Amino acid sequence: MLQKLVLDKLEEIEKRFKEIENLLTKEEIISDLSRYQSLLKERAKIEEIVEKFSEYKKLLKEREDLEVMTKEEQDEDLRSLAEAELEEIEKKLEKIEFDLKALLLPKDPNDEKNIIMEIRAGTGGEEAALFAADLFRMYVGYAQKKGWKVEIVSSNPTGLGGYKEIIFIVEGKGAYSRLKFESGVHRVQRVPITESSGRIHTSTATVAVLPEMEEVDVEIDPKDLRIETFRSGGAGGQHVNKTESGVRITHIPSGIVVQCQDERSQHQNREKAMKVLRARLYEYYQREKENEIASQRRQQVGTGERSEKIRTYNFPQRRVTDHRINYSSFQLEEVLSGELDEFIDRLILAEKEEQIKKLFEEVGATS
């Protein structure tokens, strides 16, 4: 059964929904386009909650009727049938109660944003760089399945096809809401191609996921920037440029340095570098502002040490384990090709469960 506090909030939302429905039929509202659109937007935000709450109340009534039937029905077969139905209703109620609580949680304002992902080789030398390349391909595969666009900002490739570092943008609806859980240290256990004795090695790569920020989200004073240009290779590191198209931007107050050289023109490189700088500055200011909160998302890059990990990719056993939710899949190849939803869906659920738990702990402490 939902707590009184939750029921009161749901009834308040339902009442507001009915008010909006009524207002939208009034001539003075219809003729005021700005007010009309504002009400439509407000209605859309709460519509799912109202529908779920209506379904919840319907299930409560069904449960009540079935409880009476299980107590008063004389026919044994009908009573058994009612008991079985009651069991199903209880399961549905449990699920819908969780959904309603989750819908009442505050939304992450960055969930619908595009993202900037940074992958860096950690412990393990060349093998770590190869693993960083595997992770990059995994995220490209996932983005393709979602119909999202991937654009490389900068990369530092190695001779064997790995990456010491690669930074890229993922553009698509809800990209941050799905991929923010990838932040942290990823660990691989396998026999490296450079290993002649066939011994299994452990290497790491770190992943950071930053929401892409608009200029209005992060204010940058041009006087705080030192912008340098340098000669660079062209796209993918080919063709030496005779012009200085590479761009390095230093944000002097924070010490953050961003550089981009993958595009042919200085203007394009500067534009991409500014995107990364805005995202890093947003994360920097957030961390400063909420320094006391040791949240996973704000400690993204990590040190790359073997002990600090969120997920392990074990090649000999074809197993991928996410240590935050203690979940393993034995579909290693599929995961590395971009089949990540089985992990992401569980991580979203775990996050909601944790948020609900904290919310009601706080409510209990103040009531």
UniProtKB/Swiss-Prot annotation:
Q: What is an example of a GO molecular function annotated in this UniProt entry?
A: translation release factor activity, codon specific
Q: Name one GO cellular component term.
A: cytoplasm
PTM description: Methylated by PrmC. Methylation increases the termination efficiency of RF1.
Family matches, as SMART domains: PCRF (SM00937)
Localization per Swiss-Prot or TrEMBL = Cytoplasm
List modified residues, type N5-methylglutamine: 238
Q: Does the keyword Protein biosynthesis apply?
A: yes
Q: What is its main location?
A: cytoplasm
Record's keyword terms, sorted:
Cytoplasm, Methylation, Protein biosynthesis
Report the record's disulfide bonds: none
UniProt entry tagged with the keyword Cytoplasm: yes
- What HAMAP family does its record include? Rel_fac_1
Described function: Peptide chain release factor 1 directs the termination of translation in response to the peptide chain termination codons UAG and UAA.
Q: Which family does it belong to?
A: Belongs to the prokaryotic/mitochondrial release factor family.
- What's this protein's name? Peptide chain release factor 1
Species source reads Dictyoglomus thermophilum (strain ATCC 35947 / DSM 3960 / H-6-12)
